[in-house]
Amino acid sequence: NSTAFTFIINHEPVNNNKSLQIFTKHGPLAFLPLSKFQTSIVFSINKKSFIRSDSEVYDLFKKYNKIYKKIKFSKIEKVELKFEVARHYYHDEILLFGDSLHQIHPLAGQGFNMTIRDLQILINEIIKIKDLGLTINKNLLKEFQTKTKSYNFLYSNSINLIESFFKIDN
């Protein structure tokens, strides 16, 4: 139901050390600092908003931007947002990871946080297997799936529910 419009802005130097997310009637607008001079913008716009052109996205950004001055915009990239959680985390000895494992709305970067948590669990499982002198095989993948699947399902559905609350028109 949403499209993420992403672009980079170059701007006058600012103390750019905090991410910011604004919830607009069109969808969440995230400011993700890259340096004192650059910021990544992710604007997840509801399809009901009928915002389609790059110029409309730039105009909306300008409306909500209160921080950055003398802006130069990069080209906008568009990504259709979808919600998917894999039923099976591995096949043979191939493990799905990151967005191939769980695609959720980029609300406050929670998909990335889920991937970092998954990575920590995988690393801990690898260390445990190596400490026992065992070889890494399909059992590792099965254990990883067992430890992460229910949490990922619950967490991703919670993010999906929270995101849907922001779409409610009052």
Stretch-by-stretch model annotation:
Residues S49-K138:
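FAD/FMN-dependent oxidoreductases across multiple families
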Residues K66, N124-N170:
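C-terminal helical "tail/cap" subdomain of flavin- and related membrane-associated enzymes
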Residues S2, I116-L119, T148, I159:
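Short amphipathic alpha-helical/adjacent loop interface patches that line ligand
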